[in-house]
Each structure stands twice: as C-alpha cells, then as structure tokens.
Amino acid sequence: MLKNKGHSSKKDNLAVNAVALQDHILRDLQLRNLSVADHSKTQVQKKENKSLKRDTKAIIDTGLKKTMQCPKLEDSEKEYVLDPKPPPLTLAQKLGLIGPPPPQLSSDEWEKVKQRSLLQGDSVQPCPICKEEFELRPQVLLSCSHVFHRACLQAFEKFTNKKTCPLCRKNQYQTRVIHGGARLFRIKCVTRIQAYWRGYVVRKWYRNLRETVPPTDAKLRKKFFEKKFTEISHRILCSYNTNIEELFAEIDRCLAINRSVLQQFEEKYGHEITEEEWEKIQVQALRRETHECSICLAPLSPAGGQRVGAGQRSRETALLSCSHVFHHACLLALEEFSVGDRPPFHACPLCRSCYQKKILES
C-alpha cells in the first residue's frame, strides 16, 4: 500500500510539473509583456466592456478656447522606464522549476547601465537595426546597455514576437527612454553651425582685407591697382545717364514729324497747276500792279509807247504760283545762288513760299 501511494504521489508530481512547464511555455510564447510593443490590441476587449458600463455625462460648451500647455524642456528631457508591471509568477516559477524574472532595476542601477553604454559609445554610433543616426528621434536603453531607436525596437519585437535583445540575445530585458543621442546631435549641429559662421566671418574679413590693403609684391600690387582702376572706371560709366531708349524715342518722334511735314508739302505743292489756275494767278498778279522786278529793281517791261531797239532784247517775265512776278533771268540767278534750297523746291524772294513758275509771253 505504501509503495502504491508513493508511486502515485510521484506520478502526481510529474503531472503537476509537466502542466506547470507547459503553462510557462505557453505564456512565454504568447509574450503579452513586451516593452515597447503596442498594447492596444490586448486591451480592446476590456475597453469595449468598460464602454458599455460607462455612464454618459453632459458636456457643457462655454465657447472659451482651451489654453494649450506647451511641454517644458525638462519634461522632454525626462527619462522614464517603459516596461509594464511584471506579470505574476507562473506555476513553474512558484514550484522552482524555472527561475523567477529579474527584479525591476533601481535608478542607481539604471545609472550604471547608462554609464556603461556611454563608455561603449552606443549613442555616438548609428542604430544597430536601421543603421541610421539617432538624431532627435526617441531612443531607448536596454538593461543590457544596448541602445536602439524606439520605433526600430518596437518593430523588431512585433515581427519576432520575442523579447530578446537584437545584439546580445538577452531575454526579458528592461527598457528606459533616454535622450543621449538627441543631446549629442544638438551639440553636433551647434558645432557645425558655429564652424560655418566662423568660416563665413573669416572669409568676409579676408576679402575685405584683399580689397582695401594693397599687397607688397610688385606684380600683385600692379594687378591690385589695375583692378581698382577698372572698378572706378566702371562706376563712372554707370553714373552717366545715357537713356538710349529716350534717344531712340526722340529720333522716331522727329522722323514722324518730318514725314508729316513732307506729306503735307506734297499734298499742297506736289500737283501741277492747271491753265485755269494759272489764269487766276495771273489776274491776281495784275491786281497787284507790280511794275518792277523786286530782284533787280528794273522795270518788268518797257514803258508804254516805247519800243525795244534792234540791238536790244526784251527780258522774259516769270509768273510764280504765289502771284509774284520777276525777270526770268533774275529768278534763275537767284535759284542758282540760293544755298538752302534744292531743286525743284525753291522759295519766293518775297513771301518765302515754295512756288511753281510760268514764263509769260512778252
């Protein structure tokens, strides 16, 4: 009987141990206690059940805008642990078949882990998962002193479904948000900006020095003064107001005026005078009662009753379109010696108008 009882108790212990190990393995494979993975999927059913039991409350809208509280710099630089509360011990851990999970690290222990990471230079190097710089993106520190992007570690836990460090393969690590990479990136940016600014200031100062102080070398000094002379000449040329467009506009305006004057002249004097018009002009000249040539001041024709001698030749008389009468020979001489007039346009000696002439029969 005692043997049977002892044998049965051993079997019961083996069964309990097997069940405990299976339960631990199942819980470990389900992996419901990830550090940075999204917990929203595991809590959907709980939220739905709570929403059914929730009491609705009236919302009073006062019309006032809510004041947005800007996050302080201290809060943005604050470090905090991401791990949820540790799950209760499984049956295998309670029976001592599997060791319990490590306890939560204290602030001093986290400081030691952080110092170890700084000595390794993990924040200076790129993220081991995405191979990119940390810059200002969220950064997490593991309890094994390795550093990753928070989004990269979240994606790694999501697709591997294991809480294992991507580098050292440590299980059930703890995570803490740090800002060492962001701080180093800001220092790097400030250093680069200062370097660019100092370079700009020095280059500007040296360029001004080259433009104001002549060099001591003879060839360089010659080039320096040649450049200065060229700049001064260019400034003098630029100071002159040429106004080429205004000059061209004035030329076009003068040409248009000249064309209009010539067109009016051609309309007025370009056509030939008919016989009827010459008769009217001759009648008008007779009314003037002009008896002497205004050029030579000699009589246009012999006095009445006087005849021209055999050796003398009567002088021809020219009638102009302006109704003035002159000796034809005198008018020809005047046309020949006139400087400003060009044939066939000549000006009358009396009224200074252009004319056409007709020789009158004696």
From Swiss-Prot:
InterPro entries xref list: IQ_motif_EF-hand-BS, RNF32, Znf-RING_euk, Znf_RING, Znf_RING/FYVE/PHD
GO molecular function: zinc ion binding
A Pfam match: zf-RING_UBOX
The name this protein goes by in its record: RING finger protein 32
Keyword vocabulary terms for this entry: Cytoplasm, Metal-binding, Repeat, Zinc, Zinc-finger
A single Gene Ontology CC term: cytoplasm
All copies of domain IQ, residue ranges: 186-215
Predominant location: cytoplasm
Lineage: superkingdom: Eukaryota
PANTHER family reported for this sequence: RING FINGER PROTEIN 32 (PTHR14991:SF0)
Keyword Nucleotide-binding found: no
Organism: Macaca fascicularis (Crab-eating macaque)
